């Protein structure tokens, strides 16, 4: 069963997908969306979910450094409920503290330009979220 990993931001959603064995995560794309309309990314996600035969979703849960859930975390929880209801697949939330910073560091070390980093940072964060989940399984 393949798993989709999502890094949900206010304007974009980074998307990653696991291999069939659940060992590795690969970046798929970054979807632009409007977080005030939870269904604005449904069409693109539907294509990915059916093309890759996804059976589960992992959504990054941004927590504050003290472990509490803030506004962004609540937004991720709302989106997780939406995904579960619309696509009828189980969703787990995964602590994503510092994944975007780690993704930024990896891209900086790869000597990627700022404009290129901006295009792939969310997809890279989704890969790190999903890979973290796969590694602990």
Curated annotation (Swiss-Prot):
CDD domains: YqgF. GO terms for molecular function: nuclease activity. Gene3D superfamilies: YqgF/RNase H-like domain (3.30.420.140). Coiled coil: none annotated. GO terms for cellular component: cytosol. Keywords: Cytoplasm, Hydrolase, Nuclease, Ribosome biogenesis. Its EC number is 3.1.-.-. Its main location: cytoplasm. The keyword Transferase does not apply. It is found in: Cytoplasm. Belongs to the YqgF nuclease family. This is Putative pre-16S rRNA nuclease.
């Amino acid at each position: 069963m393949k798993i989709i990993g999502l890094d949900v931001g206010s304007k974009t959603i980074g998307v990653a997908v696991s291999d069939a064995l659940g060992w590795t995560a690969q970046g798929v794309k970054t979807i632009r969306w409007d977080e005030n309309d939870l269904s604005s990314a449904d069409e693109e996600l539907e294509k990915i979910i059916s093309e890759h035969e996804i059976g589960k979703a992992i959504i990054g849960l941004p927590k504050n450094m003290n472990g509490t859930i803030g506004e962004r975390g609540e937004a991720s929880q709302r989106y997780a409920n939406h995904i579960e209801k619309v696509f009828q697949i189980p969703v787990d939330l995964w602590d994503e503290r510092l994944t975007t910073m780690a993704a930024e560091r990896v891209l900086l070390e790869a000597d990627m330009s700022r404009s290129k980093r901006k295009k792939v940072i969310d997809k890279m964060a989704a890969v790190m979220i999903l890979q973290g989940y796969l590694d602990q399984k």
